[in-house]
Amino acid sequence: MSQIRAFLAIDLDDDLKPKIHKIIKEFKQIDADIKYVDLQNLHFTLKFFGDIDTDGIDLISSKIENVIKDFDSFNIKIKGCGAFPNTNRIKVIWVGLDEDEILKNLHDRLDKEFNSIGFDLDKKYSSHLTIGRMKSAKGKADVKKTMETNKTVDIGTMEVNTIILKKSTLTPSGPIYEDLIEYRL
């Protein structure tokens, strides 16, 4: 029995990536210790499973299908820039979403289904697109200023019509993602 590191995600539309790239370029002008996410890896995580047995993929897949049958495609508005856990202790730099009830409902329904097969419930779901991770406090003041400048930046709207079960392989140069199964809404 083998294991993979897996998560369920929504990929960012390609036509919105140039706007995200523009924001990343602003951060790159700062002398800060930030590891940036590759544009092709940008996604919204719906559920991080961690290491799972490959035998369990069919069960996870059936739970996903059980939930998404009740959902049609929907639009999300991508906007704003911030940090986790907060702007005083920056670990993750993100681009956010206008709070979306359909996306929250989709997440909550999936979370309950996964909990029924032994996965922990998410503590608090905050949909975001990680664009970078701060490795040290170097340049923090300028990072905060750039975040403030982009606090309400409007990236655009995209249709969510697919969610994807992905495999993540960690490497020294960063994670490599592989799409395992696509689910159409």
Please give the residue ranges for each predicted region.
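Histidine-dependent nucleotide/RNA phosphoesterase domain, centered on the 2H-phosphoesterase fold
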Residues: M1-L185
